[in-house]
Amino acid sequence: MPKPRTKRQAIRDERKKKRRETHEETHEENHDERQSKRRRVDGEDRDEDEDTQQQTYNDAGDHPQPFHGNGPEKEFFGMLADEEQEYFRRADELLELNQFPSPEERHVFLQNVYKEARGKELKLASSQSLSRLMERLILLSNTRQKKQIFNAFAGHFLSLVQHRFASHCCEKLFLESAPIVTQELGGIVPETEGNYDEMEVEEDAEPDNTMENLFLMTLDEFEEHMGFLLTDRFGSHTLRVLLVILSGRPLDDSSTKLLLKSKKKEYISVQGATGASDELTHQLRAVPESFTQATKKIIQDAVAGMDFTALRVLAKHPTGNPLLQLLLELDISLNHKSDKSSAAASKDTLLYRLLPDAPASLADETSQAADFVNSMVYDQIGSRLLETLITNCPGKVFKALSHNFFGDRIATYVRNDIASYPALRVLNRFSKDDLVEAVKKIIPVVPLLVSKARYNVLKTLFERCDARGAYEEKSALTRALTDALGPNPKDLVPKLCHLVEDESADKDQFQQSPQNKTAVAAHGCHLVSTMLKTPGNASKVAQKSLVALPPDLLVKLATTAMASTTVLTTALASPAAPQNEFFHKALVGALAPHAAELAQSQFGHNVINAIVEIPSRGTDRCVPFHVKQTIIASLAGHERALRDSWMGRSVWRTWKGDMWKTRRSDWVKWAKEVDGPAEETKLKPWERRKLEQQKGPQPRQPPRETAKEDKE
């Protein structure tokens, strides 16, 4: 939000005045009708009534009251007539079914729906049953139509983002409009489809504004209420979406989706929606300088007027904490990494407000910064903010944190269910020397970690030791883990992956839920997969334990869950450990008799697909070619059953079963392509001589000295 915005504000004030006059003229005429309709549909759309919505909000118990009192007054946009509701419900059903006789009729139908929706956008967005239609219209709209929806929502965004259903429409509008900002910034004007030109043009239509200005004018409406939106149930989520757009982050990145997704949000889609290109959604987007300034302004306004105590309360607020994490990450990125000099001189950034006088103050146990870290590390909600702080803070602040808090107490933190997660973030940033010291302190508590199923701690230690080159510590961790699991090292995979039930553990944890058991088994499978990818004793022990499994447990491992299947696919893709050269041959040989069964499994078919990629000859990993022939013959014997499921069809395509049936020699050549150049070096002398004759005589190169003389 740049300071010179008087022209935008004047346009906004004029629009507000026009809407206010129109609203006052029609308010008295529609008052009685609106009240009757609200009473009639109160049981169906009760969330549209503010009192009922607030009551539901309080009774839920999941979301506390807003952080800054009651906040601004919410608007009621009225309700549609019965005929209009029926028309739009029918239109929503037709768009979802997409059973139009021809594309032309679909375009005509959409054109009529857009015409009918003009002037009713606010009512549609705030309707429980019709907000889905509004989201579909946003997905189908072109650039000019998105700008028209922006103008229809203008002046009411503050109320819309606090609404249960309208907030989703705002988020969809922001996300779909974000790539247009980048296109306009590069001088690319997105084309509008000619099918909608007739209904777009109006006599009194205002000239098109840039999407950048539309976003900035939307932010102007939130400027005085940032503190309230931090903890609003729906507004905080919409503000997260806006911050992601302003920062230029990838919209379809996995971390971004995790930040923006809602557990209760229904995924809305529609056939024929024209999405943005992958470059504008999967990569960093170019954003104008005004967006960067607006992000800094939001960070300042959001925590303006909050003292240290208020920030601590906000850090433990279930609704405000995720947004505070994003604000802190953007604050460090914009103020401490991009502009280090001004950040050091200002000391008024969000980082320094959470950790006053850092890094020097972190050495003082009585300081506010030290008190903040100690109060967050064991808090279920506050520890998430501490994770973000540890991951993104500057190096000098991290050194002070690790030296004064985590260095000596790392073994204590990793044993705790909550404090272990900030400790893992610290381990990811440790240098080799600090990591070696941390491993020495954690090794004595490995049996306790195994008994508590803290497998993610051990997984992180193996990964970081491999990345930092701490080979002795990897071997020590492997010995400590195998000793903690029992005297027999071959029990590593069955116990970590929970392939066998431990009666003693069941007695101690008789109240453990099935979901918790599945999650613990998944963490154990991830640990085994990490060990298989780690060269040295870790992979050697894991491979020996895997080969020692009986066939029934191997099949169970391949078919239980995706995490357990990953153990086998990782083992097949990893090189054999020293003194275990026949690992792949033994593993595939045990799986081959069950190939047809695994090929029809939801998870097991991935294992069969991974076998075909293993070469028949090689030093690191190989499977004899006759074993592959045995597997394809077994699959061909169950071809009819394989074709009845998508898993079986996937395996049949991957193994090229049709080629094996009709062109056996071509299949043999294809199956040996993965062997690479090693196949040519193993040729017999007469085969190599025949190959040279086919290539023809090659011209001899002149000696180097003769070539120089010719040039002279």
UniProtKB/Swiss-Prot annotation:
It holds the Pfam family PUF_NOP9. One of its GO terms (molecular function) is RNA binding. Pumilio repeats lie at residues 116-151, 221-261, 368-403, 590-633. Residues 21-35, 673-693, 702-712 have a biased composition (Basic and acidic residues). Residues 1-75, 673-712 are annotated as: Disordered. GO terms for biological process: endonucleolytic cleavage in 5'-ETS of tricistronic rRNA transcript (SSU-rRNA, 5.8S rRNA, LSU-rRNA); endonucleolytic cleavage in ITS1 to separate SSU-rRNA from 5.8S rRNA and LSU-rRNA from tricistronic rRNA transcript (SSU-rRNA, 5.8S rRNA, LSU-rRNA); endonucleolytic cleavage to generate mature 5'-end of SSU-rRNA from (SSU-rRNA, 5.8S rRNA, LSU-rRNA); ribosomal small subunit export from nucleus. Gene3D superfamilies: Leucine-rich Repeat Variant (1.25.10.10). One of its GO terms (cellular component) is preribosome, small subunit precursor. Residues 1-20 have a biased composition (Basic residues). It is found in: Nucleus, Nucleolus. Keywords: Nucleus, Repeat, Ribosome biogenesis, rRNA processing. Its main location: nucleus. It comes from the Eukaryota. RNA-binding nucleolar protein required for pre-rRNA processing. Involved in production of 18S rRNA and assembly of small ribosomal subunit. Belongs to the NOP9 family. PANTHER family: NUCLEOLAR PROTEIN 9. This is Nucleolar protein 9. The gene is NOP9.
